[in-house]
Protein backbone atom coordinates (compact mmCIF):
# COMPACT_ATOMS: atom_id res chain seq x y z
CA UNK A 1 0.00 0.00 0.00
CA UNK A 2 1.36 3.42 -0.97
CA UNK A 3 0.83 6.27 1.46
CA UNK A 4 0.01 9.70 0.12
CA UNK A 5 2.40 12.55 1.05
CA UNK A 6 0.10 13.86 3.79
CA UNK A 7 -0.05 10.44 5.47
CA UNK A 8 3.74 10.11 5.32
CA UNK A 9 4.11 13.49 7.00
CA UNK A 10 1.70 12.70 9.83
CA UNK A 11 4.21 10.91 12.13
CA UNK A 12 6.71 13.72 11.63
CA UNK A 13 4.11 16.35 12.44
CA UNK A 14 3.02 14.47 15.57
CA UNK A 15 6.61 14.17 16.77
CA UNK A 16 7.17 17.88 16.10
CA UNK A 17 4.02 18.75 18.05
CA UNK A 18 5.26 16.75 21.03
CA UNK A 19 8.64 18.50 20.93
CA UNK A 20 7.02 21.92 20.71
CA UNK A 21 4.68 21.05 23.57
CA UNK A 22 7.68 20.09 25.69
CA UNK A 23 9.32 23.44 24.92
CA UNK A 24 6.21 25.52 25.55
CA UNK A 25 6.52 27.57 28.77
CA UNK A 26 4.31 26.36 31.58
CA UNK A 27 1.47 28.59 32.63
CA UNK A 28 2.02 29.62 36.24
CA UNK A 29 -0.76 30.94 38.47
CA UNK A 30 -0.23 33.04 41.57
CA UNK A 31 -1.88 31.79 44.78
CA UNK A 32 -5.28 33.33 45.48
CA UNK A 33 -4.54 33.63 49.19
CA UNK A 34 -3.15 36.93 50.51
CA UNK A 35 0.57 37.14 49.84
CA UNK A 36 3.13 37.48 52.61
CA UNK A 37 3.44 41.21 53.39
CA UNK A 38 6.39 41.88 55.66
CA UNK A 39 5.81 45.63 55.47
CA UNK A 40 2.45 45.39 57.23
CA UNK A 41 1.10 44.03 60.48
CA UNK A 42 1.43 40.28 61.05
CA UNK A 43 -1.46 37.99 60.11
CA UNK A 44 -2.64 35.23 62.40
CA UNK A 45 -0.90 32.52 60.36
CA UNK A 46 1.83 32.39 57.72
CA UNK A 47 2.12 29.37 55.42
CA UNK A 48 5.51 28.95 53.72
CA UNK A 49 5.66 26.36 50.92
CA UNK A 50 8.66 24.97 49.05
CA UNK A 51 8.13 22.90 45.92
CA UNK A 52 10.43 20.11 44.77
CA UNK A 53 12.27 18.99 41.68
CA UNK A 54 10.73 19.62 38.26
CA UNK A 55 9.33 16.72 36.27
CA UNK A 56 10.82 15.58 32.95
CA UNK A 57 11.55 16.89 30.45
CA UNK A 58 13.49 19.48 32.42
CA UNK A 59 16.91 20.27 33.78
CA UNK A 60 17.03 20.58 37.56
CA UNK A 61 17.61 22.80 39.43
CA UNK A 62 17.56 25.32 36.57
CA UNK A 63 13.95 24.55 35.62
CA UNK A 64 12.49 24.05 39.11
CA UNK A 65 9.47 26.18 39.90
CA UNK A 66 6.86 26.91 42.57
CA UNK A 67 4.20 24.42 41.52
CA UNK A 68 2.62 24.10 44.99
CA UNK A 69 1.56 27.72 44.67
CA UNK A 70 0.53 27.46 41.03
CA UNK A 71 -1.56 24.28 41.19
CA UNK A 72 -3.54 25.35 44.26
CA UNK A 73 -1.97 23.14 46.93
CA UNK A 74 -0.73 26.10 48.95
CA UNK A 75 -4.17 27.72 48.68
CA UNK A 76 -5.85 24.52 49.86
CA UNK A 77 -3.79 24.43 53.07
CA UNK A 78 -4.24 28.16 53.65
CA UNK A 79 -7.97 27.82 53.02
CA UNK A 80 -8.34 25.06 55.61
CA UNK A 81 -6.85 27.41 58.18
CA UNK A 82 -8.68 30.55 57.04
CA UNK A 83 -12.00 28.66 57.16
CA UNK A 84 -11.71 28.70 60.94
CA UNK A 85 -11.49 32.46 61.14
CA UNK A 86 -7.74 33.06 60.93
CA UNK A 87 -6.11 35.71 58.77
CA UNK A 88 -3.59 33.84 56.62
CA UNK A 89 -0.76 35.00 54.38
CA UNK A 90 1.26 32.72 52.11
CA UNK A 91 4.53 32.56 50.20
CA UNK A 92 5.80 29.91 47.80
CA UNK A 93 9.37 29.09 46.82
CA UNK A 94 11.15 26.85 44.32
CA UNK A 95 13.72 24.09 44.88
CA UNK A 96 16.89 26.15 44.49
CA UNK A 97 19.62 27.56 46.68
CA UNK A 98 19.44 30.88 44.81
CA UNK A 99 17.43 33.92 45.81
CA UNK A 100 16.08 34.37 42.29
CA UNK A 101 16.51 32.56 38.99
CA UNK A 102 14.81 32.22 35.62
CA UNK A 103 13.78 28.70 34.54
CA UNK A 104 13.36 27.96 30.86
CA UNK A 105 10.05 26.19 31.44
CA UNK A 106 8.17 29.09 33.07
CA UNK A 107 7.88 32.75 32.19
CA UNK A 108 8.08 34.28 35.66
CA UNK A 109 11.33 34.38 37.68
CA UNK A 110 11.35 31.99 40.62
CA UNK A 111 12.50 32.51 44.21
CA UNK A 112 14.56 29.87 45.98
CA UNK A 113 15.75 29.12 49.52
CA UNK A 114 17.96 32.21 49.80
CA UNK A 115 14.83 34.32 49.29
CA UNK A 116 12.97 32.25 51.89
CA UNK A 117 15.82 32.72 54.37
CA UNK A 118 15.84 36.48 53.75
CA UNK A 119 12.06 36.71 54.16
CA UNK A 120 12.27 34.66 57.34
CA UNK A 121 15.00 36.89 58.79
CA UNK A 122 12.80 39.95 58.19
CA UNK A 123 9.82 38.14 59.68
CA UNK A 124 11.78 37.34 62.84
CA UNK A 125 12.95 40.93 63.18
CA UNK A 126 9.57 42.57 62.51
CA UNK A 127 7.10 40.10 63.96
CA UNK A 128 8.91 37.90 66.48
CA UNK A 129 11.38 40.25 68.14
CA UNK A 130 9.63 43.61 67.94
CA UNK A 131 8.07 44.67 71.26
CA UNK A 132 4.28 44.70 71.43
CA UNK A 133 3.82 42.61 68.28
CA UNK A 134 1.89 39.34 68.41
CA UNK A 135 3.78 36.95 66.13
CA UNK A 136 1.92 34.71 63.69
CA UNK A 137 1.72 30.97 63.85
CA UNK A 138 3.96 29.38 61.24
CA UNK A 139 3.09 26.48 58.95
CA UNK A 140 5.63 24.81 56.64
CA UNK A 141 4.58 22.89 53.52
CA UNK A 142 7.07 20.95 51.40
CA UNK A 143 7.00 18.38 48.61
CA UNK A 144 9.94 16.18 47.56
CA UNK A 145 13.12 18.31 47.85
CA UNK A 146 10.92 21.05 49.27
CA UNK A 147 10.64 19.09 52.52
CA UNK A 148 14.44 19.02 52.76
CA UNK A 149 14.44 22.82 52.64
CA UNK A 150 11.60 23.24 55.16
CA UNK A 151 13.23 20.86 57.65
CA UNK A 152 16.49 22.75 57.23
CA UNK A 153 14.75 26.08 57.86
CA UNK A 154 13.26 24.79 61.12
CA UNK A 155 16.55 23.23 62.20
CA UNK A 156 18.58 26.42 61.77
CA UNK A 157 15.94 28.55 63.55
CA UNK A 158 15.54 26.67 66.86
CA UNK A 159 14.42 29.87 68.60
CA UNK A 160 11.26 30.13 66.47
CA UNK A 161 8.20 27.92 67.12
CA UNK A 162 6.46 26.29 64.16
CA UNK A 163 2.85 25.25 64.70
CA UNK A 164 2.72 22.72 61.86
CA UNK A 165 5.01 21.07 59.32
CA UNK A 166 3.53 19.22 56.32
CA UNK A 167 5.79 16.83 54.40
CA UNK A 168 4.56 15.50 51.06
CA UNK A 169 6.84 12.57 50.15
CA UNK A 170 10.10 14.24 51.16
CA UNK A 171 12.96 12.88 49.05
CA UNK A 172 16.75 13.31 49.06
CA UNK A 173 17.45 11.78 45.63
CA UNK A 174 19.85 14.02 43.61
CA UNK A 175 20.11 16.58 46.44
CA UNK A 176 23.90 16.93 46.28
CA UNK A 177 23.98 16.60 42.50
CA UNK A 178 21.44 19.40 42.09
CA UNK A 179 22.62 21.87 44.70
CA UNK A 180 26.31 21.47 45.52
CA UNK A 181 27.50 23.94 42.87
CA UNK A 182 25.09 26.73 43.84
CA UNK A 183 25.56 26.17 47.57
CA UNK A 184 29.33 26.28 47.17
CA UNK A 185 29.13 29.55 45.23
CA UNK A 186 26.28 31.06 47.28
CA UNK A 187 26.18 29.60 50.82
CA UNK A 188 22.80 30.12 52.49
CA UNK A 189 23.80 29.24 56.05
CA UNK A 190 24.76 31.86 58.63
CA UNK A 191 28.07 31.49 60.49
CA UNK A 192 27.87 28.60 62.93
CA UNK A 193 24.82 27.03 61.28
CA UNK A 194 24.82 23.54 59.72
CA UNK A 195 25.52 23.54 56.00
CA UNK A 196 22.51 23.22 53.72
CA UNK A 197 24.35 20.77 51.48
CA UNK A 198 24.45 18.41 54.49
CA UNK A 199 20.66 18.50 54.95
CA UNK A 200 20.38 14.95 53.60
CA UNK A 201 23.27 13.51 55.60
CA UNK A 202 22.74 10.57 57.92
CA UNK A 203 22.68 11.28 61.65
CA UNK A 204 22.26 9.02 64.65
CA UNK A 205 18.82 9.28 66.23
CA UNK A 206 18.13 6.96 69.13
CA UNK A 207 19.58 3.59 68.13
CA UNK A 208 19.41 4.12 64.39
CA UNK A 209 20.59 6.34 61.56
CA UNK A 210 18.23 8.61 59.63
CA UNK A 211 18.66 11.51 57.26
CA UNK A 212 18.39 15.02 58.67
CA UNK A 213 15.36 15.71 56.50
CA UNK A 214 13.53 12.94 58.37
CA UNK A 215 14.14 14.56 61.77
CA UNK A 216 11.35 16.81 63.07
CA UNK A 217 12.94 19.42 65.38
CA UNK A 218 11.49 20.10 68.81
CA UNK A 219 10.48 23.63 67.79
CA UNK A 220 7.87 22.04 65.47
CA UNK A 221 4.68 21.27 67.38
CA UNK A 222 3.08 18.87 64.86
CA UNK A 223 4.21 17.11 61.71
CA UNK A 224 1.94 15.58 59.05
CA UNK A 225 3.92 13.20 56.85
CA UNK A 226 2.59 11.85 53.54
CA UNK A 227 4.29 9.02 51.68
CA UNK A 228 3.34 7.90 48.17
CA UNK A 229 2.41 4.37 47.11
CA UNK A 230 4.95 1.57 47.10
CA UNK A 231 3.04 -0.94 44.93
CA UNK A 232 1.40 -0.54 41.50
CA UNK A 233 -2.14 0.76 41.87
CA UNK A 234 -4.76 2.52 39.80
CA UNK A 235 -4.50 6.25 40.17
CA UNK A 236 -6.76 8.68 41.98
CA UNK A 237 -8.28 11.89 40.59
CA UNK A 238 -4.91 13.63 40.94
CA UNK A 239 -3.40 11.53 38.15
CA UNK A 240 0.05 9.98 38.15
CA UNK A 241 1.37 6.62 36.99
CA UNK A 242 0.24 3.06 37.70
CA UNK A 243 3.78 2.25 38.88
CA UNK A 244 5.41 4.74 41.23
CA UNK A 245 8.88 5.87 40.14
CA UNK A 246 10.03 7.41 43.44
CA UNK A 247 8.76 7.17 46.99
CA UNK A 248 9.75 7.80 50.59
CA UNK A 249 9.91 4.90 53.04
CA UNK A 250 11.74 6.34 56.07
CA UNK A 251 9.47 7.45 58.89
CA UNK A 252 9.92 10.93 60.34
CA UNK A 253 11.15 10.95 63.94
CA UNK A 254 11.98 13.36 66.73
CA UNK A 255 15.62 13.92 67.77
CA UNK A 256 15.14 11.37 70.56
CA UNK A 257 13.84 8.76 68.12
CA UNK A 258 10.19 9.07 69.20
CA UNK A 259 7.20 9.88 66.98
CA UNK A 260 5.59 12.37 69.37
CA UNK A 261 3.42 14.87 67.50
CA UNK A 262 3.99 13.10 64.16
CA UNK A 263 1.16 11.64 62.07
CA UNK A 264 1.60 9.64 58.89
CA UNK A 265 -0.46 8.76 55.81
CA UNK A 266 0.58 6.39 53.02
CA UNK A 267 -1.34 7.24 49.85
CA UNK A 268 -1.83 3.80 48.29
CA UNK A 269 -3.27 5.12 44.98
CA UNK A 270 -0.90 8.02 44.27
CA UNK A 271 2.64 8.36 43.00
CA UNK A 272 5.33 10.83 44.05
CA UNK A 273 3.92 13.69 42.00
CA UNK A 274 0.22 12.97 42.49
CA UNK A 275 0.34 13.43 46.28
CA UNK A 276 1.17 17.11 45.73
CA UNK A 277 -2.12 18.03 44.00
CA UNK A 278 -5.01 19.63 45.90
CA UNK A 279 -7.51 16.99 44.69
CA UNK A 280 -5.38 14.05 45.86
CA UNK A 281 -6.21 11.52 48.57
CA UNK A 282 -3.06 12.74 50.31
CA UNK A 283 -4.20 16.37 50.46
CA UNK A 284 -7.66 15.35 51.59
CA UNK A 285 -6.05 13.68 54.62
CA UNK A 286 -3.73 16.65 55.19
CA UNK A 287 -6.60 19.13 55.09
CA UNK A 288 -8.73 17.06 57.47
CA UNK A 289 -5.89 16.75 59.97
CA UNK A 290 -4.94 20.41 59.56
CA UNK A 291 -8.51 21.49 60.29
CA UNK A 292 -8.53 19.34 63.43
CA UNK A 293 -5.22 20.73 64.67
CA UNK A 294 -6.27 24.31 63.93
CA UNK A 295 -9.45 23.77 65.94
CA UNK A 296 -7.18 23.02 68.89
CA UNK A 297 -5.49 26.40 68.47
CA UNK A 298 -8.76 28.16 69.31
CA UNK A 299 -8.76 26.38 72.66
CA UNK A 300 -5.31 27.76 73.37
CA UNK A 301 -3.66 24.36 73.29
CA UNK A 302 0.11 24.17 72.93
CA UNK A 303 2.21 21.13 72.30
CA UNK A 304 4.20 19.90 75.29
CA UNK A 305 7.10 19.69 72.87
CA UNK A 306 6.74 23.38 72.16
CA UNK A 307 5.49 25.22 75.26
CA UNK A 308 6.45 28.54 73.73
CA UNK A 309 3.88 28.23 70.95
CA UNK A 310 1.74 31.24 70.28
CA UNK A 311 -1.63 30.64 71.99
Where are the regions a protein language model picked out?
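Active-site catalytic motif of lipid deacylating hydrolases and related acyltransferases
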Residues: 35-135
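Serine-dependent carboxylesterase/thioesterase catalytic core
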Residues: 119-235
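Bacterial N-terminal signal peptides that target proteins for export
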Residues: 2-11
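Alpha-helical scaffolding within the catalytic cores
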Residues: 31-36, 74-77, 206-212
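Disulfide-rich extracellular domains of secreted proteins
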Residues: 62-65, 69, 80, 84, ...
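C-terminal catalytic-base region of ester-bond hydrolases, centering on the histidine
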Residues: 213-311
Amino acid sequence: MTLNPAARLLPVLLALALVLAGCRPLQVFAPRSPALNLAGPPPDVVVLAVSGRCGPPCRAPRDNWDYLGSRGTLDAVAGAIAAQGYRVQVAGYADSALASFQPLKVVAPQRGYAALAADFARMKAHWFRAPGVRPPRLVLLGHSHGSVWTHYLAQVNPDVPFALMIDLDGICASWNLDHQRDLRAHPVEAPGQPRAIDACNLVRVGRGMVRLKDVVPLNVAHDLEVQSKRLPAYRSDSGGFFVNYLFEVTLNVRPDGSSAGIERFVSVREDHSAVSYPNSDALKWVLERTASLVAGWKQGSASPLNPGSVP
